[in-house]
């Protein structure tokens, strides 16, 4: 897993395979961190967008 900044209020999570991406997206969808605005899944990534930069650490913990 690799975390890449994506602007002031988002982080892109890169995963090794589709299975990992599905599990992460499901978990984040069922138990979103406070301030999560959007989750954008792709082939092996999930973009996590939050309301404020202060909320990023909780979103990726």
Predicted features, each with a name:
Residues 1-61:
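Conserved "landmark" site that anchors the functional core of diverse proteins
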């Amino acid at each position: 897993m690799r975390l890449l900044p994506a602007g002031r209020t988002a982080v892109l999570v890169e995963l090794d395979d589709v299975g990992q991406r599905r599990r992460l997206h499901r978990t984040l969808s069922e138990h979103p961190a406070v301030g999560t605005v959007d989750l954008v899944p792709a082939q092996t990534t999930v973009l996590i967008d939050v309301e404020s930069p202060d909320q990023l650490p909780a979103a990726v913990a």
